[in-house]
């Protein structure tokens, strides 16, 4: 799938937050994807025609970006193009939560990705949340499956172990690196990468499982190189971008279908 992605080089439109825009763009370029970053409402009709997929990230939400996201969903939905929603911090404020619900209720979102607190809040499971990180008491399988069922989406829940569900099946993906939680934008780039893989129009559940596995293996490879060179967060970030650009043989042993 990665080889096909790089051959096709899809154009992926990102309505993302200003904290991570450059990192997301560089990460997509490393993947072999052409990034397009725009939140100008007037551009949405034209950009929907030329882009292969859309990723919406509400990390720095405001009234203008809300209107832009709504218009973008309307345009991409009409063209039957994949849309990924990353409801960043939706468990932290009423504005984020209400906006996430409104975007999901548009029925244009094909994939919802977030952490346990974010997905948990959207399905009514109480989670303890601080900033963009989360701790939860409900089982991850319950949260991700319920999210997929409630919103008729592929649900992707990231963390130490990733979980992906279509509402019927749940698959878990292990591996990765603790450094992913120590850099800004890892989740935001993950959402954009989700949109990239979905642009290939393959089975969406399998596409998200493959993406999660690749992302974790790239992170593990970057951590290994960083530690070998006595590095930490900073060097991990650079090695991670390198790893995203390299061919990686997926380890299927890290993927498990849950009961």
Curated annotation (Swiss-Prot):
- Name of one Pfam family that matches: HK
Q: Which UniProt keywords apply?
A: ATP-binding, Kinase, Magnesium, Metal-binding, Nucleotide-binding, Thiamine biosynthesis, Transferase
For binding ATP, which residues are annotated in this chain's numbering? 113, 158
State the needed cofactors, names only: Mg(2+)
Q: Which reaction does it catalyse?
A: 5-(2-hydroxyethyl)-4-methylthiazole + ATP = 4-methyl-5-(2-phosphooxyethyl)-thiazole + ADP + H(+)
Q: Which CDD domains match?
A: THZ_kinase
The Swiss-Prot or TrEMBL record annotates one GO molecular function as: magnesium ion binding
Q: Mind telling me which InterPro entries this protein's record contains?
A: Hyethyz_kinase, Ribokinase-like
Summarize where substrate binds, as residue positions. Answer: 37, 185
UniProt pathway: Cofactor biosynthesis; thiamine diphosphate biosynthesis; 4-methyl-5-(2-phosphoethyl)-thiazole from 5-(2-hydroxyethyl)-4-methylthiazole: step 1/1
EC number(s) on file: 2.7.1.50
GO:BP terms for this protein?
A: thiamine biosynthetic process; thiamine diphosphate biosynthetic process
The Swiss-Prot or TrEMBL record describes its family as follows: Belongs to the Thz kinase family.
| Free-text function comment from the UniProt entry | Catalyzes the phosphorylation of the hydroxyl group of 4-methyl-5-beta-hydroxyethylthiazole (THZ).
Q: What is this protein called?
A: Hydroxyethylthiazole kinase
- Species name for this entry? Helicobacter pylori (strain J99 / ATCC 700824)
Annotated gene: thiM
């Amino acid at each position: 799938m990665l080889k096909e992605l790089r051959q096709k080089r899809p154009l992926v439109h990102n309505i993302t937050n200003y904290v991570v825009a450059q990192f997301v763009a560089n990460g997509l370029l490393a993947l072999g994807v052409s990034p397009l970053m725009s939140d100008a409402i007037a551009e949405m009709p034209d950009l929907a025609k030329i882009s292969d997929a859309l990723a919406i990230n509400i990390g720095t939400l405001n009234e203008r970006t809300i209107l832009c996201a709504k218009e973008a969903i309307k345009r991409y939905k009409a063209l039957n193009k994949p849309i990924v929603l990353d409801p960043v911090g939706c468990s932290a404020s009423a504005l984020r939560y209400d906006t996430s619900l409104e975007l999901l209720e548009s029925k244009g979102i094909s994939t919802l990705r977030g952490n346990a607190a974010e997905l948990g809040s959207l399905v009514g499971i109480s989670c303890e949340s601080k900033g963009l990180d989360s701790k939860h008491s409900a089982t991850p399988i319950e949260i991700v499956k319920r999210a997929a069922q409630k919103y008729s989406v592929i649900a992707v829940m990231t963390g130490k172990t990733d979980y992906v569900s279509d509402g019927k099946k749940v698959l878990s993906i292990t591996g990765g690196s603790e450094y992913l939680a120590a850099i800004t934008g890892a989740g935001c780039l993950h959402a954009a990468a989700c949109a990239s893989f979905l642009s290939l129009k393959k089975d969406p559940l399998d596409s998200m499982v493959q993406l999660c596995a690749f992302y974790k293996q790239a992170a593990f490879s970057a951590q290994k190189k960083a530690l070998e060179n006595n590095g930490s967060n900073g060097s991990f970030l650079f090695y991670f971008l390198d790893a995203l650009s390299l061919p990686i043989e997926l380890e299927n042993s890290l993927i498990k279908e849950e009961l």
